[in-house]
């Protein structure tokens, strides 16, 4: 038996890709191209560039465009490349969206405006204006724990009426609200919290925008594929296998440990930019244990000692 799901407009397994930096904090475009290639070769059919895990608050508009172009050049013919363009300023978000479209992005990730905590009418206007500004499909990003404002279910239903608002990255953790919206719209839901991927699939989601997928993309894809073909027991077994990294990557800010995991795997990532700080030796040691518990074996020699 197969499980029937709505279409997945951006793919099934997307990684919220880190932005690689050199040891002195400069943008590492060669590293970004290598990392994007690795991700697509290892189970990802989509990438999100300049999202939260991409440290978008600390990259300039020009850096975002250069990064996007480098990733598109590397894998744009093999994977969906989604540009994170969300800010807390509608005009700035529109500018970033238009630059991303011109650069060749396949879609846009637009986070709820943060800090200013707009009312639902403000969210409606913001997302509609951004969606009107380009011809690209839009994935809304609902993460009230970071932004301070949730997209209420009724607002989500109204936003779904826009022809270019086609998906949601759901990091709200409210399964009742997600179920309510899924029952009333054609929006494609993507889990924005790795540990909730399988539960969200069970209520109609189509995939994940993940962080552990930097090194566990193949296994995450296998979990989703098992569920889609009706092998719920197989999907559950993979979910349980991956739980150590689904939770372990988030003992501190996800990008900090994502970059530590990339170092452990010998992959490009480099340091984080301030005000974030790199993982401590203790955090890296625990992360290595988590990765090993989830089945990862390809640790780079001496990776714990390397920085950048």
From Swiss-Prot:
CDD domains reported for this sequence: DHDPS (cd00950)
InterPro entries, per the entry: Aldolase_TIM, DapA, DapA-like, Schiff_base-form_aldolases_AS, Schiff_base-form_aldolases_CS
EC number(s) stated in the UniProt entry for this protein: 4.3.3.7
Record's keyword terms, sorted: Amino-acid biosynthesis, Cytoplasm, Diaminopimelate biosynthesis, Lyase, Lysine biosynthesis, Schiff base
Localization: Cytoplasm
Subunit structure, interactors included: Homotetramer; dimer of dimers.
Family per record: Belongs to the DapA family.
Protein name, as recorded: 4-hydroxy-tetrahydrodipicolinate synthase
Annotated source species: Acidothermus cellulolyticus (strain ATCC 43068 / DSM 8971 / 11B)
């Amino acid at each position: 038996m197969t499980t029937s799901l709505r279409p997945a407009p951006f793919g099934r397994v997307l990684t919220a890709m880190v932005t690689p930096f050199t040891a002195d904090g400069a943008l590492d475009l060669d590293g970004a191209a290598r990392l994007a290639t690795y991700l697509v070769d290892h189970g990802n059919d989509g990438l999100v560039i300049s999202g939260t895990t991409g440290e978008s608050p600390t990259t300039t508009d020009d850096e975002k465009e250069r990064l996007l172009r480098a990733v598109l050049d590397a894998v744009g013919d093999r994977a969906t490349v989604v540009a994170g363009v969300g800010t807390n300023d509608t005009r700035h978000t529109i500018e970033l969206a238009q630059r991303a479209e011109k650069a060749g992005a396949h879609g846009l990730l637009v986070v709820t405006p943060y800090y200013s905590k707009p009312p639902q009418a403000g969210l409606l206007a913001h997302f509609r204006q951004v969606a009107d500004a380009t011809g690209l499909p839009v994935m809304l990003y609902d993460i009230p724990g970071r932004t301070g404002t949730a997209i209420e279910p009724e607002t989500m239903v109204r936003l779904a009426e826009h022809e270019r608002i086609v998906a949601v990255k759901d990091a709200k953790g409210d399964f009742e609200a997600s179920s309510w919206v899924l029952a009333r719209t054609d929006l494609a839901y993507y889990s924005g919290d790795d540990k909730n991927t399988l539960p969200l699939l069970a209520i109609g989601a189509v995939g994940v925008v993940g962080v552990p997928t930097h090194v566990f993309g193949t296994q995450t894809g296998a979990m989703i594929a098992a569920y889609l073909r009706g092998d719920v027991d197989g999907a559950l077994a993979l979910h349980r296998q991956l739980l150590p990294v689904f939770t372990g990557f988030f003992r501190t800010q996800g990008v900090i440990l994502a970059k530590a995991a990339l170092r452990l795997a010998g992959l490009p990532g480099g340091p984080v930019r301030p005000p974030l700080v790199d993982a401590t030796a203790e955090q890296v040691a625990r992360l290595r244990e988590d990765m090993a518990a989830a089945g990862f074996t390809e640790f780079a020699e001496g990776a714990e000692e390397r920085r950048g």
